[in-house]
Each structure stands twice: as structure tokens, then as C-alpha cells.
UniProtKB/Swiss-Prot annotation:
It comes from Laccaria bicolor (strain S238N-H82 / ATCC MYA-4686) (Bicoloured deceiver). Residues 1-16 are lumenal. This is Maintenance of mitochondrial morphology protein 1. It is found in: Endoplasmic reticulum membrane. It is a single-pass type I membrane protein. Keywords: Endoplasmic reticulum, Lipid transport, Lipid-binding, Membrane, Transmembrane, Transmembrane helix, Transport. GO terms for cellular component: endoplasmic reticulum membrane; ERMES complex.
Length: 291
């Protein structure tokens, strides 16, 4: 009988090489699975997060309304900042159902958690748990108001804007590994994302008189500055803290989403409806694709 089997009772160099490679792969798989991945049904029990430690406050206090507006400066936007702060405060209050303190914080947290799980990609992200939310205390500050030169509309106004606040979000989730089988393992991830700074120029375009759906258009510059601070923990038993690539990925995704939605159209009462404006936007996008 010929002795040309791959495996035999007498080990050969080829057999030893194959067994050695397999043992290394098995060892690496065990290290990844038992140190960093979590195969339990409740990953948060084995990878608890100290939310009080992750939640950072930078000590910003609410800005008080100015006692005197700068009436002598024609380019001052302080009057608009007063209005903008009031509008932002109303949105914060609505998100909290008008309730102060811990009760209002819990309502805002639940709403954001429900929305996050509604839009999450369920194929590779487990349930998202929001631990805490800080809605901030400030509002964007506008300054250096000016009329744009050589603009299509003679009344286009441009501002410079800056926004620094305590806005932050702490959450936990798991990245799902579906190979070689569905939900083979989970990689627990805990994040705290905070706004450090946002800067951009903002353009306000008045409605066109001849437009069938007149709207007020607000857009930010595509060259805006966005700085986020992230605190991260990855892993189950052995944890990786503050992975730089994860910070870069989060900042890139937030920038991409903000750039894609950099233009807002405000429907003017009595001149157009939301449905009409949406149809007009779809038509503009179709014309842009054809051209």
C-alpha cells in the first residue's frame, strides 16, 4: 500500500507545519474570544460602565442675557443671539417634557435611546443603552453679520458662528460578529461623546418672490470645524481604553451626517406647506441627478 497519506502515525515535516499553524490560529481565536469578545446574552453584566466617571462636565454656566444690546454697531448679531438662546431653551424643555431635574433628564434619555435603537443597523450592532444625556446650557453664538457680495440673491446674509457647550452622550452597545454563525460573539463598547467646539459660517437666504413654495433657507459652510471629545472602552474581560481609530471613525461619521444635512428649509406660515416643500426638494434632487 503506498505511503502517500497527508497524515500518518509517523509525523512528517509537512504534518508538523500544518499542526503548528492550526494551533496558532486556535490560540489566537481563544485569546480574542475570551479576553475581548463576549459570548453571553447580556454583555452589559460583564462589562459594566462607571457612568459617573465617564460623564464629564466642563463647568459651563448658562449665559445671562445682556443688559444692553449694541445698538451703535450695525453689524451686531446680539439681538439674534438673544432670540436663538430662547429658541434652543424651548427645544431643550420640550425634549424633557418641561420637567426639571432628574425626571426631565430621564425622559430625554429614554427618547434618545428609542431613537438610537430605531435607526441602528441591527445586523452588526446590539441594543444601544443610553446611560446619560447632557443637553447643554448654551446656544450657538453668531457674530460678524454681513451681506454676501455677488450672491444670487441681493439679500443673502452671512454670519460667523461658534458653539461651545457641555453637550454630551454616554452609551453602551456591542458589535456583533456573525461569522462563522449568527451572533457568534459580541464586542462590548462603551462611549462618551462630548462636543468640544463647532465653528462655521452660516448663510441665510430669503425666499424667492416667484417661487411656488417660498422658504427661508439656512445653510452652513462645507468647511465647518467640528471637534468632539470621546472616551471609550472596548472589550469584555480585557478592555482597550480610548482607541484613537474609534475616535476618528466617530468624528468622521458625525461630520459626514452634518455635511449631508447642511441646508435647512424653513416653511413660512401661509406661503407653503411641508408637503409642498418636500416635493420641491425631491424635484430639485432629480434635476441635479439628470444634469
Amino acid at each position: 500500500m503506498p505511503n502517500n497519506y497527508v497524515f500518518s502515525l509517523q509525523p512528517t515535516f509537512t504534518q508538523g507545519l500544518i499542526l503548528g499553524q492550526l494551533s496558532i490560529l486556535v490560540l489566537l481565536g481563544m485569546i480574542l474570544k475570551f479576553l475581548f469578545l463576549d459570548s453571553t446574552q447580556h454583555p452589559f453584566e460583564s462589562s459594566s460602565v462607571d457612568t459617573d466617571l465617564l460623564r464629564r462636565k466642563r463647568g459651563l454656566e448658562p449665559r445671562h442675557l445682556p443688559e444692553e444690546l449694541l445698538h451703535d454697531n450695525a453689524e451686531s448679531a446680539e439681538w439674534f443671539n438673544v432670540l436663538l438662546r430662547q429658541i434652543v431653551d424651548v427645544y431643550r424643555s420640550k425634549l424633557r417634557d418641561g420637567l426639571p431635574g432628574i425626571e426631565g433628564d430621564e425622559i430625554a434619555r429614554r427618547r434618545i435611546e428609542n431613537y438610537a435603537n430605531k435607526i441602528r443597523p441591527s445586523g452588526f450592532l446590539d441594543h444601544i443603552e443610553i446611560h446619560s444625556v447632557d443637553l447643554g446650557v448654551s446656544a450657538p453664538e453668531l457674530f460678524n453679520a454681513r451681506v454676501r457680495q455677488n450672491a444670487p440673491s441681493p439679500a443673502e446674509t452671512e454670519f460667523d458662528a461658534t458653539y461651545t457647550d457641555t453637550l454630551s452622550l454616554s452609551l453602551s452597545t456591542s458589535y456583533l460578529f456573525n461569522y462563522p454563525m449568527q451572533s457568534f460573539a459580541r464586542l462590548p463598547i462603551s462611549l462618551t461623546i462630548s462636543l468640544s467646539q463647532f465653528k462655521s459660517s452660516i448663510c441665510i437666504i430669503p425666499p424667492e418672490i416667484t417661487s411656488p413654495t417660498p422658504v427661508l433657507t439656512i445653510s452652513i459652510s462645507p468647511n465647518f470645524v467640528l471637534d468632539l471629545s470621546t472616551t471609550s472602552l472596548m472589550g469584555s474581560r480585557a478592555k482597550l481604553a480610548n482607541v484613537p481609530k474609534l475616535h476618528e471613525l466617530i468624528q468622521h461619521q458625525v461630520r459626514r451626517i452634518l455635511a449631508a444635512r447642511a441646508t435647512w428649509k424653513v416653511v413660512l406660515p401661509g406661503l407653503a406647506s411641508v408637503v409642498d416643500v418636500k416635493e420641491e426638494i425631491k424635484k430639485e434632487m432629480s434635476d441635479a441627478d439628470l444634469s
